[in-house]
């Protein structure tokens, strides 16, 4: 069975790129933080990728809600953001993100990061 991922980004082009790069996984998509949180609660994915700056709820707010719920707290979360200052990256990681990738990211870096996080969380990555 393919690992289930939730992808949340309000930029349609970024979502399309991520979906293309991670097409070997079972993907659910949200364009805002509120919907991302709903999907994470419904789907209980193996991994979530959240943009930091989204409407309705930021990625950090979604992260906080996920970590605050015992049912969703163990889900690995990769934050994606154009904000690449050291303080912002540290804030994301200290808030409970598993990883933090700065946009624009290299396609191979995203795929590698997802595979590593899934492997670390004891899910077998999908071979392409």
Question: Where do the language-model regions lie?
Answer:
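Receiver (REC) domain active-site loop signature in two-component systems and cognate sites
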Residues: 54
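Conserved acidic segment of CheY-like receiver
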Residues: 2-12, 18, 48
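C-terminal output helix
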Residues: 105-114
């Amino acid at each position: 069975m393919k690992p289930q991922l939730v992808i949340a980004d309000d930029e349609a082009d970024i979502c399309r790129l991520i979906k293309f790069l991670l097409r070997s996984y079972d993907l659910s998509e949200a364009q805002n933080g509120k919907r991302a949180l709903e999907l994470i609660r419904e789907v209980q994915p193996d991994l979530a990728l959240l943009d930091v700056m989204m409407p309705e709820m930021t990625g950090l707010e979604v992260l906080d809600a996920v970590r605050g719920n015992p049912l969703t707290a163990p889900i690995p979360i990769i934050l994606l953001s154009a904000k690449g200052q050291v303080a912002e990256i540290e804030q994301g990681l200290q808030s409970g993100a598993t990883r933090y990738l700065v946009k624009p990211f290299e396609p191979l870096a995203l795929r590698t990061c997802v595979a590593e996080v899934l492997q670390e969380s004891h899910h077998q990555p999908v071979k392409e």
